[in-house]
Amino acid sequence: MGRKIIYSILFFIITILIIILLIYGYFKIIGLESRVPEKKENLYSIRTEKYLDRKVFIVTPNEGKTSDEVILYLHGGAYVGEIEMEHWEFIGQLITDIGATVILPDYPLAPKYRYTDTFKMVEPLYKEIVDKVGAEKLTVMGDSAGGGMSLALVEKISTETNYKIPSKTILISPWLDVRLTNSEIEKVEKYDKQLNKETLKLAGLAYAGEDGINNYLVNPIDGDISKLK
C-alpha cells in the first residue's frame, strides 16, 4: 500500500510539472485529440474513423501514383504531443512518392494515459490491418517517440503473438530508451534547440506509469529484436 501511495504522489507531481512545462512552451499540445489539416485535401483524401473511442486517420492519394502498400504510422511527440503539421507534411510526401495508404492513429497520450492504454489501441489495430491486407503489404513506421513505439509494437508482435511481423519496420530518430541512460546525451544536449533531457524524463515517467520505467514496451532498446527484419 505504501508503494502505491508513493507512486500516486509521484505521478500527480509529474502531471503538474508537465502542465507547467506546457504553459511555458516546452510541449505545444498535451493530451488533446489531433485535428485534420484544412489545406491538404487537394493532395490526399483523409477519412476519419472511430477506433476504440479514439480517432484513426486513413490517408489515401487523390491522384498520381498508387499502390496496395499500407503504412501504419505512429507519430512522435514525446508521448504527450498530438499529431503536428510536420507529420502531415511528411505523410503527404510519402503518399506522393509511393502512393501508399497511410493509417495514422490518434493514440492515447500521457499524462492522462499510460503505455498500457496506448498498446490497447495500437496492437489490435495492427492485427486488424494484417487481417485485412496481410503483413507482407504492411510497413510500420514512426518518428521519435512514435519510432520507439513502432519498435516496441513489432517486438511485442514477434514475441507474444502468433501474428506475422510487418514486411518493413522503419524508425526515424527513434526514442528507444526513455531513461536516457546514454552518456553521450550530455555531450550533445547543449546543441539541441528543441528537446531537453529533464523534460523528456518527465514525459517518459508519465508514459511508463506505475508499472515502472524498465518495461521493454517503454524502452524497446531492451526488447528482443532477433525475429525482426
Task: Walk through the language-model features, giving the residues of each.
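Alpha/beta-hydrolase superfamily serine-hydrolase fold, recognizing
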Residues: 18-25, 36-229
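Short Lys/Arg-enriched alpha/beta "domain-start" segment
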Residues: 28-32
